[in-house]
Amino acid sequence: HVFQNMGDGTYYHSGSLAIRAAVAAKTPVTFKILYNDAVAMTGGQAMDGPLSPTIIARQLAAEGVQRVVLLSEEPERHSESDLPAGATLLHRDALDSVQRELREVEGVTAIVFDQTCAAEKRRRRKRGLMPDPQRRVFINEAVCEGCGDCGTQSNCLSVTPVETELGRKRAIDQSSCNKDFSCLKGFCPSFVTVEGGRLKKPKAVEAL
């Protein structure tokens, strides 16, 4: 069974034709359509046309895709009545279990994953177009035992290894952290959340 990633821009441009061909060939494949609300390959522009996760789900069902699952970081923004018959609406945390389920299905299945692109989210926050959570996450190095469960749960690049005298531990790279907070799902008492705090700006380097 094959899992194939596809962005929403690619789907809108020509990717739907590949899905149609896979359905005709009865290929055992799951298309993971990433609805990230921006055309990443050309600079983060908005989609040039009417498209939404529920529209994609209905199109996939109309093309003959056997199972369609819509995963979202905010499932409450969608209504199951807007989905085609047989489609499922779940929180993004169910991704692993959904993939394990769909790999057992013969033929074409699809996951529509609805989450704004991390880079686009950061860009909008800087421009005041999206709320910026006034919370930051830190890891207490003295408590961390380096188990790595925070990285396993979040799969986040901002959870970085730190070499200490007591071995490798973990830290949050604040410069790249996108405030997704998935790392807090790690089974660990070392996390500290700070409300309303701001990062200290580094001192300017004097010119030589």
Regions found by a protein language model. Give the residues of each.
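Thiamine diphosphate
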Residues: 1-41, 48-54
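Short coil/turn connectors at secondary-structure junctions
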Residues: 1-2, 7, 24-30, 63-67, ...
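Conserved active-site and cofactor/substrate-binding residues in soluble primary-metabolism enzymes
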Residues: 17, 24, 51-55, 63, ...
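Glycine-rich ThDP/TPP pyrophosphate-binding loop and its adjacent helix/strand module
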Residues: 38-129
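Iron-sulfur cluster-binding cysteine motifs and their immediate structural context
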Residues: 114-116, 121-127, 145-202
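Flexible, low-complexity linker/loop segments at domain and module junctions
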Residues: 129-131, 206-208
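Short, flexible loop segments at boundaries between secondary-structure elements
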Residues: 133-149
